Amino acid sequence: MTAHLKKAELHCHIEGATPPELALRQARKYSVDTSAIIRDKAYVWEDFTSFVRCYDSVASLFRTQGDYALLAETYLTELAEAGTIYSEIIVSPDHGNTIGLGADAYLEGLAAGMEAAKAKTGIESRMLITGIRHLGPESVAKTAEYAAMRRHPLVTGFNLAGEERMHSVAEFARAFDIVRDAGLGLTIHAGELSGAFSVRDALDHVRPARISHGVRAIEDADLVKRLAEEGVVLEVCPGSNVSLQVFADFASHPLRPLYEAGVRVTLNSDDPPFFHTSLAQEYEVAAHVMGFSDSDIDRMTKTAIEAAFVDEPTRERLLAALHV
């Protein structure tokens, strides 16, 4: 069991963290039929395209600041109960605008939930604003401008998510320059649905501190060596990768070879209930399926805190908390 281990997470999409039970309550609140996306208290999808449709349907059940406060507090409290001391959630102001709530109110609702969870459990958390790749470079640049301007104390990073196979990384370089100049931490989805080349392109054109996923770097030995030498941190999500059939099973997942090659890796849950996982389950799989020792896993957690987009006093407190 890994229940005794402190945990930290750098990669979770907040709408994708919605427990099915909460989605059902929200559906009743707004009189929405969820029979096509939730059956037997589990989300229903078959492939990446239907997963995105299901995800969007669940996200549409959150419509007010209070809804988003509830979502953030629910997820972070669940994490804290599993021994998690730090969490970064990926958030989309574009979604706040799309539903008519507005980006500012969307962020404020999430922030209220984060603060409530911290007051209740002590868990520290931050938000990473994400651009949506398949909406195109201009849309992502506008999101980057918003992130740079907003200056919310809990917004500390920027990500690029969405359909990895649309648009080249180079087309988003301007967006990342905007947020880099604003002092935000940088990470980008790459090396998940697209191959090793997408990780290399991200390193060349975006120069991020971290890569969201990045696991298909394993297809290129020189790239793996580069990741290790440059100290780029991978936000690895094994349960997600297996559910989406990026890899057939945990036995063929490259977390261990990446770790043994000296790449800095961390454990994450991505969209946990959609993939029948949780951060606690990812730690269990690492220990009992992939064979990592407690000290190996502690090292991954320490890496997550070292790579977290937080101020240095907060980082020092979190590192100290690992050994309490």
Curated annotation (Swiss-Prot):
It is an enzyme of class 3 (hydrolase). The active site is at E192 (proton donor). One of its GO terms (molecular function) is zinc ion binding. Signal peptide: none annotated. Coiled coil: none annotated. Belongs to the metallo-dependent hydrolases superfamily. Adenosine and AMP deaminases family. Adenine deaminase type 2 subfamily. This is Adenine deaminase.
